[in-house]
Amino acid sequence: MANIKSAKKRAIQSEKRRKHNASRRSMVRTFIKKVYAAIATGDKEAAQKAFHDMQPIVDRHACKGLIHKNKAARHKSNLTAQINAMQ
């Protein structure tokens, strides 16, 4: 544990940020899972709607550095391909 006042403050801030980022990361994963679930049901309209809800959230968090930009691009690319492959 830190002894210096500023180090204690930084530890508190770091823990606070960690919890905030964990909840945001969980939210992003949930939106991605909703798209996969819609694809699994075979409903193309629902899958497209879930994708359009997910896309700006993934982009925003990739821009802020919560997830890597390549990971965001990979998710969007894979999901788009799966949605387009649906009948």
Curated annotation (Swiss-Prot):
Pfam families in UniProt: Ribosomal_S20p
Gene Ontology molecular function: any one: small ribosomal subunit rRNA binding
Name of encoding gene: rpsT
Keyword rRNA-binding annotated: yes
InterPro entries listed in its UniProt record: Ribosomal_bS20, Ribosomal_bS20_sf
Any one Gene Ontology cellular component term annotated for this protein: cytosol
Stretches for region Disordered: 1-26
The UniProt record lists the keyword Secreted: no
Biological process (GO), any one: translation
Protein name (database record): Small ribosomal subunit protein bS20
Keyword terms of this UniProt record: Ribonucleoprotein, Ribosomal protein, RNA-binding, rRNA-binding
HAMAP family: Ribosomal_bS20 (MF_00500)
